[in-house]
Design a protein with these regions (language model features):
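N-terminal glycine-rich, Lys/His-bearing helix-loop that initiates the first secondary-structure elements
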Residues: 1, 294, 315
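Conserved PLP-enzyme active-site core in the AAT-like
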Residues: 2-222
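Conserved residues at beta->alpha junctions
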Residues: 13, 300-303
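Generic structural motif
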Residues: 16, 127, 156-158, 233, ...
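Generic recognition of short, well-ordered alpha-helical segments
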Residues: 96, 311-312
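Conserved C-terminal alpha-helix-loop-beta "cap" of PLP-dependent enzymes
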Residues: 224-301, 308-311
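C-terminal alpha-helix
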Residues: 312, 316-319
């Protein structure tokens, strides 16, 4: 929980869109505008009575265009307009300008929700930047050891300087309070995992970030890799934005395209642990965000030795 949040709740859910649905604050008659092109299927259920609009980019212009004609309100009765982005996410690991989106959302009477899972509370503070609600799947916080999938939801403070009130944040708080949700009952094992994870979070996340940076630099220099997306690289479309949005580095994820083989073929040449290790754990993990027949790989750096990881990847790339 960030010091700047008004309250935080835990939800048992597979991922952030599922948690947002379970919170019940996006209601029938609302419009939900989302940029999550690598996770669009997650919005296909759970928001059936809402007008869900998927946009092709994280820009203010895209969200504003998708919001036209909707008469939104910050009153508890609604209807409400929701804007959903990831602090790092989408194909290409995009980094939206959360400050600009936060300002534009308030002008449009929209409620900005940020999935902060990839960056984590260590790497980004969406509430400080303009979001009214920040949600984060806790796989990495729990170091991959949680008995079940948990998502934390933090609500922004509505009291601003000079006794001003942020109507958007107050609306989000009122909606959540109105649901009257009971606190999630955690087992003793879950409490221990969370406490240990939070105690060690800073050091572990810095290790994830540092290793991602090293692996991104290795991949960018590898002749067997077609292209690399990592927010620190100047070739990334959001590099300039990311320097002012992200903290302690540029996140734990790197995306790259293979030159001469598919993701499925590449995985077959690697040890199984790259695919089967727990999400958020110490072992570097790979996925195929566009499917195994495509050539795109997404890498989440663990805390393992990046030289060993790079050597293993290099062997597979050259086979």
């Amino acid at each position: 929980m960030r010091a700047g949040s008004r309250e935080a709740r835990l939800v048992a859910a597979l991922h952030v869109p599922a948690a947002l649905s379970l919170l019940g604050i996006v209601r029938p008659g609302d419009r939900l505008v989302a940029f999550a092109d690598d996770f669009a299927d997650a919005f296909a259920c759970g928001f059936d009575a809402c007008d869900v609009v998927m946009v092709g980019g994280p820009s203010v212009a895209a969200f504003a265009a998708a919001s036209e004609g909707f008469d939104a309100s910050f009153d508890a009765e609604g209807p409400h307009l929701w804007w959903f982005v990831n602090s790092i996410g989408g194909f290409g690991l995009r980094v939206p300008d959360l400050r600009a989106l936060g300002r534009a959302a308030r002008v449009t009477h929209a409620l900005l929700v940020v999935d902060n899972t990839v960056a984590s509370i260590f790497g980004c503070d969406p509430l400080r930047l303009g979001a009214v609600l920040s949600l984060e799947a806790l796989d990495r916080v729990c170091a991959g050891d949680a008995p079940r999938k948990l998502v934390a939801a933090s609500v922004a403070r509505s009291q601003l300087k000079r006794h001003r009130v942020d109507a958007a944040a107050e609306c989000a708080h009122a909606l959540l309070e109105g649901r009257g949700l009971a606190s999630l009952d955690l087992s003793s094992d879950e409490v221990k995992v969370l406490e240990h994870g939070l105690d060690s979070l800073g050091a572990r996340m810095q290790a994830h970030f540092d290793r991602a940076r090293a692996l991104a630099e290795y991949l960018a220099a590898n002749e067997m890799v077609r292209s690399v997306r990592y927010p620190e690289l100047t070739s990334h479309p959001d590099h300039a934005i990311a320097t002012g949005i992200l903290e302690h580095g540029f996140g734990p994820a790197v995306e790259f395209d293979l030159m001469d083989c598919s993701a499925g073929e590449f995985f077959s040449m690697l040890p199984d642990e790259f695919r089967t290790s727990p999400a958020g754990g110490a072992t570097t993990r790979l996925s195929a965000p566009r499917g195994k027949r495509a050539s795109t790989i997404r890498l989440f750096a663990g805390t393992d030795d990046p030289l060993v990881v790079a050597a293993t990847l290099d062997t597979a790339l050259r086979n």
